[in-house]
């Protein structure tokens, strides 16, 4: 008798997606970060749901309500620490997931990749509006600086900023709508996750070689499901250790003070996972140019499938492209460092050089390296063919 999981309409979807899913036998632990992202998203939604029960999205009470959660609510301190540090863990997994996709050529699955980039943008938006909710000093001034960038839009910029603010400055209306956005966007992200998986299962997973592996696929369960469970345990251990022993290591000290519009922090900066984009924004002296560079730094990821020039999908057998890839990773690390530094020499010039390098590497050097490798491959094939003919004759 056929198992119910293969015949029942709902169970069949689960079976085809997580149990009998044909999976390349040679995928590594780097393919684990997709499932870890799903776990992180669920943790964020659950902890956020319980925090929302006690949070007050009112300017006069929001900071006090966060203090109340930490001090008076049972295990509120643990919920808050888990939610705040869970965002950092989520973005670490996100960057590793995207880096693996770029390294092994998964970005050539265009629908899957572009939906992933949209999800990345939504998560950035969710994290930004969430950073405003505690209504600390950095929350207020970060919201003021970042939302004020919309004023760079020609003609309608001023009206657009006031529409987002709900008034003439970041105020009670801004906080209320940011809370509504922060609560809603994760559920939209869950919907996009379903689409992401749908398109992924249409093409099948990529593998480290970048070659087709139809003859060599095995069921996802139990071979990879248990490996995912191990990843879950390691992630939960890391998140719990962070929440218990160093909950404030990734947060800004200024945010422990209640928001005061009369006192400007010495150095306004977003959370660490946005610093590379913030550095690109600051590196352009013109406001409109900075906003355009910031938008392009994300949109450039959507262009990658269209400028792939190599005949090979993965970087596994492409040493020159590997060099460019790791230069790109180092460049993002430098931008992250610069984004956390004050706007003064020598950080200004380093930020500008790193910002130009970011776009040069991703939009020029990556396609050029692929084209050059194709030429070298053709030369090598021609030489081998000549040697073969000479040996035969």
UniProtKB/Swiss-Prot annotation:
InterPro entries: Cyt_b/b6_C, Cyt_b/b6_C_sf, Cyt_b/b6_N, Cytb/b6-like_sf, Cytochrome_b, Cytochrome_b_C_euk/bac, Cytochrome_b_N_euk/bac, Di-haem_cyt_TM
Record's cofactor remark: Binds 2 heme b groups non-covalently.
Cellular component GO terms, alphabetical: mitochondrial inner membrane; respiratory chain complex III
Residues noted as binding heme b b566 in the record, renumbered to the chain: 97, 196
Cofactors, names only: heme b
Entry's Gene Ontology BP terms: mitochondrial electron transport, ubiquinol to cytochrome c
Membrane-topology annotation of the record: Multi-pass membrane protein
Keyword Thylakoid recorded: no
Residue numbers binding heme b b562: 83, 182
Entry keyword set: Electron transport, Heme, Iron, Membrane, Metal-binding, Mitochondrion, Mitochondrion inner membrane, Respiratory chain, Transmembrane, Transmembrane helix, Transport, Ubiquinone
TM region positions: 33-53, 77-98, 113-133, 178-198, 226-246, 288-308, 320-340, 347-367
Location of this chain's protein in the cell: Mitochondrion inner membrane
Residues annotated as binding a ubiquinone: 201
Annotated Pfam families: Cytochrom_B_C, Cytochrome_B
GO MF assignments: metal ion binding; ubiquinol-cytochrome-c reductase activity
Keyword Mitochondrion: yes
Extra remark: Heme 1 (or BL or b562) is low-potential and absorbs at about 562 nm, and heme 2 (or BH or b566) is high-potential and absorbs at about 566 nm.
Reported function: Component of the ubiquinol-cytochrome c reductase complex (complex III or cytochrome b-c1 complex) that is part of the mitochondrial respiratory chain. The b-c1 complex mediates electron transfer from ubiquinol to cytochrome c. Contributes to the generation of a proton gradient across the mitochondrial membrane that is then used for ATP synthesis.
Family of this protein: Belongs to the cytochrome b family.
Subunit structure: The cytochrome bc1 complex contains 3 respiratory subunits (MT-CYB, CYC1 and UQCRFS1), 2 core proteins (UQCRC1 and UQCRC2) and probably 6 low-molecular weight proteins.
Full protein name: Cytochrome b
Gene transcribed to yield this protein: mt-cyb
